[in-house]
Every structure is written in structure tokens, then in C-alpha cells.
Regions:
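H-loop/switch region of ABC-family ATPase nucleotide-binding domains
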Residues: 210-211
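ABC ATPase NBD Q-loop/coupling interface
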Residues: 76-91, 335-348
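Catalytic Walker B motif of ABC-type/P-loop ATPase nucleotide-binding domains
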Residues: 175-178, 423-425
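Conserved ABC ATPase "signature" region
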Residues: 128-146, 380-394
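Conserved ABC ATPase signature
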Residues: 150-154, 158, 398-402, 406
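A short, flexible loop at the N-terminus of ABC-type nucleotide-binding domains that lies
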Residues: 4-16, 20-34, 65-70, 88, ...
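ABC ATPase C-loop
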Residues: 167-168, 416-417
């Protein structure tokens, strides 16, 4: 038995008293938790708007703060009998397994199988034990076709699944997940919910920062509500479930009932396409991931000034199609036309703004303000877009200290300021 597991006998696995954390170069505190106790075996949902402190709290639990995100810690936060900030990430990983918003940031190997067995190897588990767990995971999640896949060929949703399963291969008491379903389709979300249920029955302590709340309704024991970096409310399941849709909306939270969300979407007035002229046409495009053919487009037409949604299950070619449209991939057999004029991949690239699923890969500067204007040929006033996208006041923050939602809005803002003809999200 691992020594860290032996230490966790107290039901109070995580406690905080008068705890405050401030990111380096930040004027105001980034997280304040006055009083909190989380017992072993609970599934706790961290909810609140983007930038409310959810990701910061998880970074403290898994040791990324202060090892990778420097700042000032005040008060007391204790995880499995260890004070926050007193252990290295390596030491914390023996107690806490993590799933990040950006799954590629936690991959070390080229192939899926090697990535899955890495945690057990790092923690000195027996080869037989590792293989037994891998076989069980493979059976439970139908991974047979993925084990030999190159991680770089997976879609965003597929990468997120592998990151989750890699965390599940670890022998830890605590599992923290930062928006684990952000890029998953409905079947993938249901698989996550199913396995979280199993882990909860095994007595694991699970902390999930989420905006999607519907799949957690029957799993959550508590909901921690964060607002502007402060833990404002600690709801029991009964208290949270009794909130009205109006109260939930006022808190900036999504519904627990998907049907009500769908009806609201249907009731919204449809946005008419812009009167701009010009169509983008694709002919004879084969969508591939590595050597695997995903689908074939004989002809596809995209109206200028319109919003087009690419929908489908994970791994079916949505992101791959967007890469071709943006000129990031090239198919010599395919034809691209704008207003009837042939386009090369380079032509597509020059006129396209693109926002990746893994937005951290598009952040290069050391402040939000510099990131917004990076590469622009003319000086622009970014105050309006900062205000509109909820980034006002963050101009001096390092982009990598932002929440996942704030990073995404920052990249969207920087791409919009380029004033390219097409935007792909």
C-alpha cells in the first residue's frame, strides 16, 4: 500500500481555513476560501462562471500551484494531511490524478497504449497489475481500436477521453477533473458519467469543475459555487436541486435539464445571414486522420455571411474539415473555390482566423494586452472587445494563468481583431 494512501484515514480529506491565493503579477486575490471541508468519498462539483476560481482551486489540489503557477499563498489549505504548496507536483500525483481542459498538455507518449500505462509505471506498480487494469479499461470503454493510435491523430474529444482514462489508470484517492466533457459528444458524456459512478462506489473523492451540470445530477453530493474568485456558497445536493431555473440563471449556471435548454434554443429568433456575397465551395475532399479515412465530401458549399455548424460524433472529421478550410491541411486531390475562383491552401490560410479546441497552443505573449495585438499591422483599440468578452481588468495577467473559458475568449478576441474573412471555431 502506498504511504500516501495510509495517511488518508481522516474523513476530512480536504480542509481550508482563511485561505487566499494571488497569482504573480495580479493586483487582486485570485481565490478566497474562508472555510471548507470535503470528506473522503464525496463527488463535489465546482460551478460558477468562467474565471470564477474553479480551475485555480483544482490547481492547488493537484500541486500545479505553486510549482507551475507562481503566486502568494495565505491561510491554510490541507489536502490528505499535507499543506498546499509544500509538496512537489510529483509528490501530489501520488495522491491526486488530474484531467485538464487541454488534454494534449498532459500527454508524454506518441501512442495511446504507452500513455495509458505510464502512470502505473511511474508509481512502481507491477506489470501484471497495470495490464489487468488496462484490459478492464479497454473492455469498459471499447478501446481496442485506439490502443495503437498515434495521439496526434485523435480529435479533441478523443484526446479528452484518453486523458480521462489515463487518470483512471492511476492509483490515487483523489481525482480532479477540469471540464472533462467540454469536447465530448453525448455518448462520450454518458460514458464519463458511468465511470464516475463506479469510481464513486469505490470510495474515490472526485472534484469536477464543470459548466455542464445535467450529467452530474444523480452523481453529485455537493456543489461549490465560485464567483469572482470567492467560494460564495456550499450547496448540498438537495439545496442545489431545489434552485429554480431563474435562480440558476441569475448565478450564471446552466440548467440541469437538457430539455429546457433545447426549448429555449428553439424559441430564439434565427439570425439571418449577412447580405455579403460569395460562397466557398469544396469538391472531392477526403477527410483523413493519419492513414484512417473518416469521410469523403463530394461537394460542400458554405454561404458567405452565414454561420455553419459542423456536427457529429467525436472522431468523425469535424476538426479535420475545419483544418482544411483554414488551409492548415492540404489535399492535392481536392478543389477549393471562392466565388468560382480556385483557392490554394495558402490562400485559405491568409484569409482565415482559427480558434483551436486546445486554445493554450495559440497563446504566445506574457500578458493579455500583448496577446491581443500580437501580429497586428496597425494599432487597435481593444477596449470594446475586452469589455464585450468579459476580459476587462485582465490586461496585465499572463494568459496561462487565466481559466480555460477566459483563454478561449482571449483567443477569439485576438482572432476577431485580425479582421479575416472567415472565422473557424
Amino acid at each position: 500500500m502506498d504511504v500516501y494512501h495510509d495517511l488518508v484515514d481522516d474523513k476530512r480529506l480536504i480542509t481550508a481555513t482563511g485561505f487566499r491565493y494571488t497569482y504573480e503579477n495580479s493586483r487582486a486575490s485570485s481565490l478566497l476560501v474562508e472555510d471548507l471541508q470535503i470528506s473522503s468519498g464525496q463527488l463535489v462539483v465546482l460551478c460558477g462562471k468562467s474565471g470564477s476560481g474553479k480551475s485555480t482551486f483544482l490547481r492547488l489540489i493537484n500541486g500545479l500551484i505553486p510549482d507551475y503557477y507562481e503566486g502568494k499563498l495565505e491561510g491554510q489549505l490541507e489536502i490528505a494531511n499535507h499543506l498546499a504548496g509544500k509538496q512537489t507536483v510529483e509528490e501530489c500525483s501520488k495522491q491526486v490524478a488530474s484531467v485538464f481542459q487541454n488534454p494534449s498538455s498532459q500527454f508524454f507518449h506518441k501512442y495511446v497504449k504507452h500513455e495509458l500505462v505510464l502512470p502505473g509505471e511511474n508509481h512502481g506498480q507491477s506489470a501484471a497489475g497495470i495490464l489487468n487494469k488496462l484490459e478492464k479499461l479497454t473492455a469498459d470503454f471499447a478501446l481496442e481500436d485506439y490502443l495503437e493510435r498515434d495521439l496526434s491523430t485523435l480529435s479533441g474529444g478523443e484526446k479528452q477521453r484518453i486523458a480521462l482514462l489515463t487518470a483512471l489508470m492511476q492509483y490515487t484517492n483523489i481525482l480532479v477533473l477540469d471540464e472533462p466533457t467540454a469536447n465530448l459528444d453525448r455518448s462520450g458524456i454518458e460514458q464519463v458519467a458511468s465511470y464516475l459512478s463506479i469510481l464513486k462506489q469505490e470510495g474515490k473523492t472526485i472534484l469536477i469543475a464543470e459548466h455542464r451540470l445535467d450529467y452530474l445530477k444523480d452523481l453529485a453530493d455537493r456543489y461549490l459555487y465560485f464567483d469572482q474568485g470567492v467560494l460564495k456558497r456550499d450547496y448540498s445536493k438537495k439545496e442545489f436541486d431545489s434552485l429554480t431555473e431563474t435562480e440558476r440563471h441569475d448565478l450564471g449556471l446552466r440548467s440541469q435539464d437538457l430539455s429546457s435548454s433545447i426549448s429555449k434554443l428553439e424559441a430564439k429568433k434565427q439570425i439571418a445571414p449577412s447580405p455579403l456575397t460569395g460562397d466557398l465551395t469544396i469538391k472531392n475532399l477526403c477527410l483523413q486522420a493519419g492513414d484512417q479515412e473518416l469521410s469523403f465530401l463530394e461537394v460542400a458549399n458554405f454561404k458567405s455571411g452565414a454561420i455553419t455548424a459542423l456536427v457529429g460524433h467525436n472522431g468523425r472529421g469535424k476538426s479535420t474539415l475545419a483544418f482544411y478550410l483554414a488551409g492548415l491541411l492540404d489535399d492535392e486531390e481536392a478543389d477549393f473555390y471562392l466565388n468560382g475562383h480556385a483557392l490554394s491552401a495558402h490562400d485559405c490560410l491568409k484569409q482565415t482566423a482559427f480558434v483551436l479546441q486546445e486554445v493554450a497552443l495559440q497563446l504566445f505573449s506574457d500578458s493579455v494586452q500583448k496577446e491581443l495585438t500580437l501580429g497586428l499591422k496597425k494599432v487597435v483599440d481593444a477596449s470594446n472587445i475586452l469589455e464585450n468578452l468579459g476580459l476587462k481588468g485582465l490586461e496585465e495577467r499572463h494568459p496561462m494563468t487565466l481559466s480555460g473559458g477566459e483563454m478561449q475568449r482571449l483567443v477569439i478576441a485576438s482572432q476577431v481583431l485580425t479582421k479575416k474573412k472567415s472565422v473557424y471555431l
